């Protein structure tokens, strides 16, 4: 079993029973503190965890990590390290915040931020992506927009995966305001 996912593990950080972020679910993300510091972090309960601060305090000792791996504005470099390293870091976070381990109060002040006092940011810089027509209904709807409903699905759609290049700039955070065009207008 993955140590971080042990269902019997409990955290010394108070976690509501209905929380999406118990000690068994250790996500990675990017947040900005009230002091405007951008941090690679994680979350347990209602607290954001500054992984760079943990790293500087030697909590990741024994895990092969560059000194500045968590001193970035995106997760891209950390993600390149691969699943074995992610798992080691998650296991260590679970160990650090386990009820069997205590953290010095001066470390808590540096490492933890209340989640309602931070702003979540885009976790990765997306360079490019390919999207696929994986849903028949989606492909049909798009086909109706570009062709007529009688010829919405092209014959090849049922036989090969149809992919298309997507614009990385179209990937945004939930809740971001979007300026929607009002359509084309003829010049006056």
Positions of predicted regions on the chain:
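Active-site microenvironments in enzyme catalytic cores
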Residues: 4-33, 43, 49-188
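Short, surface-exposed charged micro-motifs
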Residues: 40
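Glycine-rich N-terminal segment of FAD-binding domains in flavoprotein oxidoreductases
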Residues: 36-37
């Amino acid at each position: 079993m993955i140590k971080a996912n042990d269902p019997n593990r409990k955290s010394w950080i108070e976690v509501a029973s209905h929380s999406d972020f118990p000690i068994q679910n250790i996500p990675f993300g990017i947040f900005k503190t009230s002091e405007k510091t951008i941090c690679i972090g994680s979350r347990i309960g209602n607290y954001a965890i500054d992984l760079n601060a943990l790293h500087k305090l030697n909590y990741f000792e024994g895990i092969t990590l560059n000194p500045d791996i968590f001193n970035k504005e995106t997760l891209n470099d950390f993600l390149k390290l691969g699943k074995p390293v992610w798992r080691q870091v998650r296991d260590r976070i679970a160990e650090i915040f386990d009820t069997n381990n205590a953290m010095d109060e001066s470390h808590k002040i540096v490492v933890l931020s209340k989640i309602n006092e931070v702003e979540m940011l885009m976790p990765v810089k997306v360079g490019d992506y390919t999207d696929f027509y994986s849903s028949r209904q989606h492909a049909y709807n798009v086909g109706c927009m570009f062709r007529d409903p009688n010829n919405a699905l092209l014959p090849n759609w049922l036989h090969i995966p149809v992919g298309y290049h997507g614009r990385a700039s179209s990937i945004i955070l939930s809740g971001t305001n979007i300026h929607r065009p009002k359509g084309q207008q003829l010049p006056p």
